[in-house]
UniProtKB/Swiss-Prot annotation:
Enzymatic reactions: alpha-D-glucosamine 1-phosphate = D-glucosamine 6-phosphate
MF term (GO), any: magnesium ion binding
Name recorded for this polypeptide: Phosphoglucosamine mutase
NCBIfam families, per the entry: glmM, PRK10887.1
Organism from which the protein derives: Legionella pneumophila subsp. pneumophila (strain Philadelphia 1 / ATCC 33152 / DSM 7513)
């Protein structure tokens, strides 16, 4: 596959004004997308965004570029990423565009795309867009310019969809829920979803001002959520990120419930009901405790590369339905086409009601292993990861762990680092073993550097 110039694993992202996330580039990006999609026929694209102040500017730029290519635009306004994927399908659009930098702070923003079926754009389409970006922008004749309309009931449509993902007779009437919307795209949606299903909802992070998205709130900063759950005596806390595709939970005792535990709860329930349809997909960074808990049920477990894109790819390859990441990207392919924080939370709430169990009871079957991650500075990360002496050192440690732990080496894709991760039953021993392994690798790195010809 050709090397991408602009697209990363999840669209195009950067610091606003100091990267390609600027009005000039984004206008041309909209035009390029329009040209690739249109291919001579009238097409329609939906655009949604989170609550960053830069979203207004980027939305206008995209709209102008798409119009110049003769593509009609439907503006959704603030809308969670999975909501945009859903509405792309129901509005019969040819593509959906998300303006968001997910869990990042307001200074960043990004553009990512969904195809007509609500899935990620194929690599071939992304490469065609990049090729079009290299051409001179040409506006279609005035009679063929695209029009823009605003979908005023977009939030209501998505709220109804979310509610439809649990059994129609499910009621959350006996649950008190704190929901943290991260001052992001779910601020006007998530509280309504849960309250319309009967829950007593205490919402926080619902006052976006363009600058406070993900700021000391949401799934990446759950301290406020935890405090609120304890303070109001809630049954559960739900922490979403700025664009609503991640979720973490807090139980009534104040314990954090991460993506691995959420995957376990959902997968175990489906397995017990005979509707799991295959196995479960995690990533290279999923806790070994998840693998042990899933396989102990007699359910296959597969690891993908890190990133929800790769989780989705593996699920589709195997025709499985449930997967996700520790960070809270949870994919239920029998319900949605992408990670959806609200939908994942609803699955857990439905299980709590159906089994009449508290969240801490549902997590009792999975024991997360202590994990130590060390970032080892080196200019030889990739060489070290494949070095025979390093591989042997890893094997020796894995033998010592005796099937009750895991070792993972990952060269960083952006920094001169080798990430060394060790998991095991005892936290202090794991920390010690990780440091010993890093010391061994550092010695090998030193010898390797000395043997390399000087430049």
């Amino acid at each position: 596959m050709s090397q991408r110039k602009y697209f990363g694993t999840d669209g195009i992202r950067g610091h606003v004004g100091l990267s390609n996330i600027n009005p000039e580039f984004v206008l041309k990006l909209g035009w390029a997308v329009g040209c690739v999609l249109a291919n001579g026929a009238r097409k329609k694209v939906v655009i949604g965004k989170d609550t960053r102040v830069s979203g207004y500017m980027l939305e206008s730029a995209l709209e102008a570029g798409l119009s110049a290519a003769g593509v009609d635009v439907a503006l959704l306004g603030p809308m969670p990423t999975p909501g945009i994927a859903y509405l792309t399908q129901t509005l019969r659009a040819n593509a959906g565009i998300v303006i968001s930098a997910s869990h990042n702070l307001f200074e960043d923003n990004g553009i990512k795309f969904f195809s007509a079926d609500g899935g990620k754009l194929p690599d071939s389409v992304e490469l065609a867009i990049e090729a079009q970006l290299e051409k001179q922008l040409q506006t279609v004749p005035s009679a063929k310019l695209g029009k823009a309309t605003r979908i005023n009931d977009a939030a209501g449509r998505y709220i109804e969809f979310c509610k439809s993902t649990i059994p129609s007779l499910s009621r959350l009437s006996n649950l008190k829920i704190v929901v943290d919307c991260a001052n992001g795209a779910t601020y006007h949606i998530a509280p309504n979803v849960f309250s319309e299903l009967g829950a007593d909802v205490v919402p926080i992070g619902i006052k976006p001002d363009g600058f406070n998205i993900n700021q000391e709130c949401g799934s990446t900063a759950p301290e406020l959520l935890r405090e609120k759950v304890i303070a109001v005596g809630a049954d559960i806390g739900i922490g979403l990120d700025g664009d609503g595709d991640r979720v973490i939970l807090v139980d009534s005792l104040g314990n954090l419930v991460d993506g691995d535990q959420i995957i376990y709860i959902i997968a175990k329930d489906r397995h017990q009901r005979g509707v799991l349809h295959g196995g479960v997909v995690g990533t290279l960074m999923s806790n070994y405790g998840l693998e042990l808990a899933i396989t102990s049920l007699g359910v296959p477990f597969q690891r993908s590369k890190v990133g929800d894109r790769y989780v989705l790819e593996t699920l589709r390859e195997k025709d499985w339905k449930i997967g996700g990441e520790t960070s809270g990207h949870i994919v239920c392919l029998d319900k949605t086409t992408t990670g959806d924080g609200i939908v994942a939370a609803l699955q857990v709430l439905s299980i709590m009601v159906k089994q009449n169990k508290a969240l801490h009871e549902l997590t009792a079957g999975i024991q997360l292993l202590p994990q130590t991650l060390v970032n080892l500075k080196t200019n030889n990360a990739a060489l070290l990861a494949s070095n025979p002496d390093v591989i042997q050192a890893v094997k020796n440690l894995e033998k010592h762990l005796n099937g009750e732990g895991r070792v993972l080496l990952r060269p960083s894709g952006t920094e001169p680092l080798l990430r060394v991760m060790v998991e095991g039953a005892n936290a202090s021993i794991v920390k010690q073993q990780a440091q010993m392994l890093c010391d061994d690798i550092s010695q090998i790195d030193k010898k390797m550097t000395e043997s390399l010809p000087s430049t």
